[in-house]
Regions:
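Non-catalytic connector elements of ABC transporters
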Residues: 58, 68-180
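Internal alpha/beta loop-helix hairpins
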Residues: 2, 7, 12-81
Length: 180
């Protein structure tokens, strides 16, 4: 494109290809544009729940706002977990929401000194080894909800085994909430 000086429209169903090759990507849903944006914005700042679910991997919870302070909300999931999350807009108490969180936003055995983290225990269900794309498949105790967590291949987590109970956490700025 840059060498020829021409704009191209390329249609693909391969998300990775679209994100790597494009200056702008259009995400369509049932023949309508959901979001037209840079690959970085589609991934990091989806504007609709459809785009959040469609582009990349996500962990998702449904729940409601139980408390708000400016643009910070306390969310309770349907499973009873409580998280703090930064909102783009203030939502009143009782608002039903969907919360999305990327697997790479979750920290394994986070530093206890990090005060802005949502922390909770999980049980390792599977270790999905795929080199740099490795993941942990985990469940919160007494829950069948499956969560994916990026597993860095820096040897720091080689001790983790299936059935281990570990603590995970994520920064309150990492979650993306949408009113349902």
């Amino acid at each position: 494109q840059l060498q020829v000086g021409t704009t191209f429209i390329y249609i693909t169903h391969d998300q990775s290809e679209a994100l790597v090759m494009s200056d702008f990507v259009a995400v369509m849903n049932q023949g309508r544009f959901e979001q037209v944006d840079t690959p970085q914005n589609l991934y990091n700042d989806p504007q609709t729940p459809f785009v959040a679910r469609f582009v990349g991997e996500n962990n998702a919870w449904s729940g409601q706002v139980v408390l708000t302070e400016d643009h910070l909300a306390h969310i309770e999931t349907r499973e009873g977990q409580r998280f703090r999350v930064r909102l783009k807009q203030t939502l009143p108490q009782g608002t039903q929401i969907d919360l999305f969180l990327r697997p790479e936003a979750m920290l394994i055995q986070p530093d206890p000194g990090l005060s802005t983290l949502n922390r909770f225990a999980v049980v390792v269900k599977a270790i999905l080894f795929d080199g740099a794309n490795s993941r942990l498949l985990v469940n919160p105790p007494q829950s069948d909800r499956e969560l994916l967590i990026a597993l860095p291949q820096n040897r720091q987590y080689d001790h983790i085994r299936v059935a281990d109970r570990i603590e995970v956490g994520w920064d309150l700025n990492s979650g993306i909430c949408f009113k349902t």
